[in-house]
């Protein structure tokens, strides 16, 4: 895909305090995660709730592969990016299991922790996921 990113002018921590030496960064990533069903037979989706380790997309043991933009700093002009999926440590892909794909594009990389710079702007275009 292609992206451009402008961080907001003032970074705040999760206590709404200014962090003067910190500049916001964006985050673009995708994860492949194993299906887990609730009592009604529906997949339990991963979320941004970092307080629930198993439901949180960043820590869930169900995530087996991840692809991510390496540098989330300011990019003024449209820039092409690619990211390859890599198996996480001690994980394997089992073709007999069902998996789900989640794609996250965030203007504040730590926004799920309620930290970032208001006004940060991430624009993504022509995002594609391809398989081999």
Positions of PLM-derived features:
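Extracellular beta-strand-rich recognition modules
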Residues: 1-3, 7, 97-107
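Extracellular-facing segments of soluble proteins and assemblies that are Gly/Ser/Thr-biased and enriched
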Residues: 2-38
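Outer-membrane beta-barrel architecture
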Residues: 23-27, 96-101
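Hydrophobic core segments within long, regular secondary-structure runs in both alpha-
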Residues: 27-30, 54, 60-62, 124
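Hydrophobic residues positioned within well-ordered beta-strands of beta-sheet architectures
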Residues: 28, 81, 101, 124-125
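Short, well-structured beta-strand
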Residues: 33-36, 89, 99-102, 110
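Extracellular carbohydrate recognition and processing domains
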Residues: 37-95, 117
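Extracellular carbohydrate recognition
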Residues: 75-77, 93-98, 108-131
């Amino acid at each position: 895909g292609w992206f451009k990113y402008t961080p907001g002018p003032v970074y705040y921590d999760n206590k709404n305090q200014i962090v003067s030496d910190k500049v916001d960064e964006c985050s673009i990533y995708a994860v492949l995660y194993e299906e887990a069903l609730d009592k009604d037979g529906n997949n339990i989706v991963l979320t941004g709730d970092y307080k629930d380790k198993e439901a949180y997309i960043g820590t869930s043991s169900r995530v087996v592969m991840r692809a991510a933009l390496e540098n989330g700093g300011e990019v003024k002009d449209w820039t092409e990016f690619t990211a390859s999926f890599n198996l996480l440590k001690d994980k394997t892909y089992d073709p007999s299991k069902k998996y789900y794909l989640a794609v996250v594009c965030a203007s504040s990389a730590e926004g799920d922790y309620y930290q970032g710079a208001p006004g940060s702007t991430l624009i993504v275009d022509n995002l594609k996921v391809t398989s081999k």
